[in-house]
């Protein structure tokens, strides 16, 4: 989102059950795309419910496991949608095969982000936008 959304969006990443470190294949994939991983760290989504947290307009959950989880009460009432993807960390095989799974999910997420960015956000009311984002999560 930070690369595709230019200056229109600032994206953050967090999880319900963060690991101690970013997955090594995630780092490798991002490095392959010349994305700086130096400032990235694994973090809990609870960091984004604190008073000093950045204001969120949209929150997309992406892990197939979070679909049934109780999400935090996000401050500011952002629009939320679930875009379920397979967890590439669960892929089995050689490192190359596993990296291919990470790459596939990276591309799938990128495709959804491109569609999101193509929506006429300033012309859609909140309910219409919510429907669009929910529908996007089904495809």
Q: What kind of feature is each model-predicted range?
A:
Residues 3, 32, 62, 110-111:
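Generic detector of well-ordered secondary structure
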Residues 13, 61, 81-84:
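Structural signal for conserved beta-strand scaffold positions within catalytic alpha/beta enzyme cores
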Residues 48-51, 69:
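Short amphipathic alpha-helices and their capping/turn segments at secondary-structure boundaries
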Residues 54-55:
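Alpha-helix C-terminal capping/helix-to-coil transition sites in glycosyltransferase folds
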Residues 64-67:
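Short glycine-rich anion-binding loops that position phosphate/pyrophosphate groups of nucleotides
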Residues 70-139:
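Phosphate-binding/catalytic loops
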């Amino acid at each position: 989102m930070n690369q595709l959304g230019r200056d229109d969006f600032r994206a953050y990443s967090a999880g319900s059950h963060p690991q101690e470190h970013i997955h090594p294949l995630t780092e490798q994939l991002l490095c392959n795309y010349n994305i700086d991983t130096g400032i990235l760290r694994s973090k809990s989504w609870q960091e984004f419910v604190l008073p000093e947290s950045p204001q969120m307009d949209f929150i997309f959950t992406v892990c197939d496991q979070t679909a049934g989880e109780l999400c935090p009460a996000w401050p500011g009432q952002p629009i939320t949608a679930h875009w379920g993807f397979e967890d590439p960390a669960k892929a089995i095989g050689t490192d190359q095969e596993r990296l291919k799974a990470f790459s596939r999910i990276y591309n799938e997420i990128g495709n959804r982000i491109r569609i999101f960015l193509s929506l006429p956000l300033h012309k859609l009311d909140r309910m219409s936008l919510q429907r669009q984002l929910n529908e996007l999560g089904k495809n």
